[in-house]
Amino acid sequence: MWYRIKISREINQQGVKKPITEYYLTDAKNFAYAGLKVIDTIGKNIEVEDILLMKSYKPAINEYKQGNKVYIIKIAEDMTDENGNIKTIKYPMPVFANNDAELYVIVKNFIKQGLNDMRLTTISETKWIFLS
């Protein structure tokens, strides 16, 4: 499962404490492991004011490579229930790419693999920090 985690902490800039908020995206067994991964990465001697699980995501559709940006896409799928009613299910997924052109190729290839009617509804570029 993929987790987006929000960290609130203070940094010391020229003798003045400045509050900052950072977002991390990581793959972990559960939220506890995800939080531990973030704290291990940013350093044990840094005081964290707040750690918050923001959201969990379906698995990413591609592998992270060093320098990639983190994008969140929203996919809509039309499903037919047992009564014959069509329901649209929307879900966000992380995607890693160097630029928009590469992102569109990755998403286009992913949607082609879908067994049901899949559509791309939104793309958001994030400033999240990816933890492997």
Residue ranges and their predicted role:
Residues W2-E10, Y71-D78:
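A short beta-strand micro-motif
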Residues R9-Q13, Y64, E82-G84, F130-L131:
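A short Gly-Trp-Pro
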Residues I11-T26, I86-M93, Q113-L115:
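A cross-kingdom feature marking solvent-exposed beta-strand/loop segments within repeated
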Residues P19-I42, F96-D100:
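Hydrophobic, ordered structural segments
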Residues K44-E47:
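The feature represents the first ordered module of a protein
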Residues E49-L115:
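Short, solvent-exposed interaction modules
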Residues G114-S132:
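Glycine-rich, aromatic-bearing surface loops/beta-hairpins
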